[in-house]
Amino acid sequence: MASNKAFTLAVANLKGGCGKTTISTNISAGLTQRGRVGLVDADPQGALKHWVDWGSKEADAQVPVLYSDHTDPVQNLKLAQPNHDFVVVDCPPSLDMAITCQLMIECDFILIPVLPSPLDLWASTQTIEMIESARKTNPKLKAALVLNQTEPRSAMTRAMQTTIERLGVPVLTTSVRRRAVYRNAVVEGVSVFQLGARGRSAADEINQILNEVIPS
């Protein structure tokens, strides 16, 4: 269970396609400005490993340390925690529900990305139920939903912000806007923090999310 080790943040949603890995990469990049960051890629697709490998080739890049020596992501997490100020975990999809629950027990905070559509919202209820299960072992575990790929002027986005509050899990004030720069960063193998003026608005957005999540 998380205690006085690194602040451990997991990005989790049992539904795929919610932007989980994109948020994980940019959050971990933002945290490198605040301390030592470890990264655990628990998603079998291994997208974070490719990102770290690519990013480490950039001369000015501050790249989190990836823990992937063990096939068991929980073991990788326990190895990372004593050596860093922050650890970010990209959780697996619904194929590995047992592993996700074990990871949650070791975390301080679960961030749940949700796309602004009713189907995605309903699919997230299973993740929320898993968090409640993890809290039986780790009662201090906190969680919040973050709307991803939002369009502020969209009626759907406004309706979702109202509906999502009924799930009983806090919703971050900051949402992740639908921005081409997030896709561009992936293509270039970097984070939005490395894109200069092009990525400034997105980087500010990620920092605002971190300000809401990380204890002051």
From Swiss-Prot:
Localization in the cell: Cytoplasm, Nucleoid
Gene inactivation effect: Carboxysomes (Cb) are no longer evenly distributed over the nucleoid region on the whole cell length; 76% localize to one cell pole, 7% have Cb at both poles while 17% lack Cbs. Cbs are nucleoid excluded.
Reaction equation(s) it catalyzes: ATP + H2O = ADP + phosphate + H(+)
Residues engaged in binding Mg(2+): 21
Function, in words: McdA and McdB together mediate carboxysome positioning on the nucleoid and prevent their aggregation in the cell. McdA is an ATPase that forms dynamic gradients on the nucleoid in response to adapter protein McdB, which associates with carboxysomes. The interplay between McdA gradients on the nucleoid and McdB-bound carboxysomes result in the equal spacing of Cbs along the cell length.
Domain remarks: Has an adenine-nucleotide sandwich dimer structure in common with ParA ATPases. Nucleotide-binding forces changes that create an ATP-binding pocket.
Subunit and partners: Self-associates, associates with McdB.
PANTHER family in alphabetical order: COBQ_COBB_MIND_PARA NUCLEOTIDE BINDING DOMAIN-CONTAINING PROTEIN, P-LOOP CONTAINING NUCLEOSIDE TRIPHOSPHATE HYDROLASE
Designated name of the protein: Maintenance of carboxysome distribution protein A
Organism: Halothiobacillus neapolitanus (strain ATCC 23641 / c2)
